[in-house]
């Protein structure tokens, strides 16, 4: 009997060690990838040799950690889905014993914990630490900046928890909620994270439909269009004229204080870079020009309409079945049953659709005018913008599993703290969310594909002159018949 207990304890110990090693390796890979991504966009001029360099290194480490957690949140649902199918295909294989329900639940809990840590502690600390200078009267240095940052974090925490306490007291009229703060960990922190999750899902609701329509323009800029859709020779001629004009202005010293020599050199480099890209597009083969572009556009159409159809079907399920609610569904255990009719193929298609929604949400986020100034630029992004971008990506990626389950894109149950949000059990919020997503996506697609027809109709009836004031802000696309959203 004692030997059996020792054997069980040893197995549990080895299982926990194995899970820790796997989690560490996965996070190390994500951290390395995130580091190179940030270094690609971070401004090189931010690297000083004084205390500011130390502050920048600390902020860079925290931003890299946050971006790695964001990557883990994005991969969380696809990894869980594919792991469930692998366990069903090879239930007793020796080589996949490490892949079990305990590991998956541990990953969900770790991502939830680190998301909270980055959102409420690390990112505010990085921002305040970067902007701090030390209190007046104290000796300048790293210690003074750390002291100021900690005090600012304490004041921010008091402000946020005060707002959350008032909000929860207004919603719940019981005397306990208005008189006590003892249940801070059990009540107010989950309530705060639930509000942040709802805000992230609302941000995804705003960004994803815009991104789904914007993806056609983005892919059109990356791929080589057929000759009938764009005239590369004309574009190269225009770029060559711009390059010659900038070169003459630079050589002649014809620039003012507003249009300095540095800006002329920057515009000249951009013109030459655009010219080299156009030359590569011109030298593309015939199959790239006539086959790849239509195939990609068709795939985008299929993925977009598939997401709209799945959301529409989910609305019908919500109306007739209580288990369709994201918080009310209690499926079988991990690795016990498949969630797809077509097994591995269905899981693969679902994972592709989830990644497509995430990419579309990021594209839509940077396409919105309010967030367009956040767009990172290669080797020209300040550390403050890096912090803002990492925080935005964290909010979007943390809400991705919740949005995918709420819209019915996947039937995989939310694990850990992701499935404990109160608003997931509200029928009206979930149905309204699905309806708004379907309607907004349809309207964005209709606006996208009818823009050329709408412009021609306005020209035919003479109303295009009324929009002359807006044409300077809306730059046409290279093919001349599409407008960016």
UniProtKB/Swiss-Prot annotation:
Compartment(s) where it occurs, according to its Swiss-Prot or TrEMBL record: Membrane
Pfam families with a match to the protein in the record: LMBR1
SS bonds (residue pairs): none
Bilayer topology annotation: Multi-pass membrane protein
Stretches of the chain found on the membrane's Extracellular side: 1-18, 83-109, 171-191, 312-338, 404-425
Keywords, in A-Z order: Coiled coil, Membrane, Receptor, Transmembrane, Transmembrane helix
TM spans (from-to): 19-39, 62-82, 110-130, 150-170, 192-212, 291-311, 339-359, 383-403, 426-446
Chief location category: membrane
GO CC terms of this entry: membrane
UniProt xrefs under InterPro entries: LIMR, LMBR1-like_membr_prot
Coiled-coil stretches noted in the UniProt entry, renumbered to this chain: 261-284
Cytoplasmic side: 40-61, 131-149, 213-290, 360-382, 447-485
Family label: Belongs to the LIMR family.
Described function: Putative membrane receptor.
The protein's name: Limb region 1 protein homolog
């Amino acid at each position: 009997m004692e030997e059996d207990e020792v054997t069980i304890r040893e197995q549990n110990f080895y299982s926990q060690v194995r899970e820790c090693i796997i989690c560490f390796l996965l996070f190390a890979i994500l951290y390395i990838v995130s580091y190179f991504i940030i270094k690609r966009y971070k401004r090189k001029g931010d690297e000083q040799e004084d205390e500011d360099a130390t502050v920048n290194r600390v902020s860079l480490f925290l931003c890299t950690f946050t971006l790695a957690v964001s990557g883990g949140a994005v991969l969380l649902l696809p990894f869980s889905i594919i792991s469930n199918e692998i366990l069903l295909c090879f239930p007793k294989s020796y080589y996949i014993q490490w892949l079990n329900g305990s590991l998956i639940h541990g990953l969900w809990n770790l991502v939830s914990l680190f998301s909270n840590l980055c959102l409420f502690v690390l990112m505010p600390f990085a921002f305040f630490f970067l902007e701090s200078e030390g209190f007046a009267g104290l000796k300048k240095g790293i210690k003074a900046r750390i002291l100021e940052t900690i005090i600012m974090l304490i004041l921010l925490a008091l402000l946020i928890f005060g707002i959350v306490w008032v909000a929860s007291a207004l919603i719940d009229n019981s005397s306990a909620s208005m008189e006590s703060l003892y249940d801070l960990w059990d009540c107010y922190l989950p309530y705060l994270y639930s509000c942040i999750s709802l805000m992230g899902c609302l941000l995804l609701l705003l960004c994803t439909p815009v991104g789904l329509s914007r993806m056609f323009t983005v892919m059109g800029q990356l791929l080589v269009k057929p000759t009938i859709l764009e005239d590369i020779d004309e574009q190269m001629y225009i770029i060559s004229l711009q390059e010659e004009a900038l070169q003459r202005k630079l050589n002649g010293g014809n620039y003012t204080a507003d249009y300095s020599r540095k800006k002329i050199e920057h515009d000249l480099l951009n013109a030459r870079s655009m010219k080299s890209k156009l030359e590569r597009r011109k030298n593309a083969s015939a199959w790239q020009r006539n086959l790849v572009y239509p195939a990609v556009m068709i795939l985008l159409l299929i993925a977009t309409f598939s997401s709209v159809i799945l959301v529409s079907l989910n609305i019908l399920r919500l109306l007739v079945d209580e288990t369709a609610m994201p918080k009310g569904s209690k499926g079988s255990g991990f690795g016990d049953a498949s969630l797809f009719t077509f097994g591995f193929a269905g899981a693969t298609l679902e994972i592709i659709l989830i990644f497509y929604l995430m990419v579309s949400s990021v594209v839509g986020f940077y396409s919105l005018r309010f967030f367009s100034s956040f767009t990172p630029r290669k080797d020209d992004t300040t550390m403050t913008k890096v912090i803002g971008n990492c925080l935005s990506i964290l909010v979007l990626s943390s809400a991705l599993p919740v949005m995918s389950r709420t819209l019915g894109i996947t039937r995989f149950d939310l694990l850990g703290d992701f499935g404990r949000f109160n608003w997931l059990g509200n029928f009206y919020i979930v149905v309204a969310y699905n309806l708004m997503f379907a309607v907004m996506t349809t309207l964005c697609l209709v606006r996208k594909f009818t823009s050329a027809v709408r412009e021609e109709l306005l020209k035919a009836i003479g109303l295009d002159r009324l929009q002359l004031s807006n044409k300077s802000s809306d730059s046409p696309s290279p093919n001349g018949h599409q407008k960016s959203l």
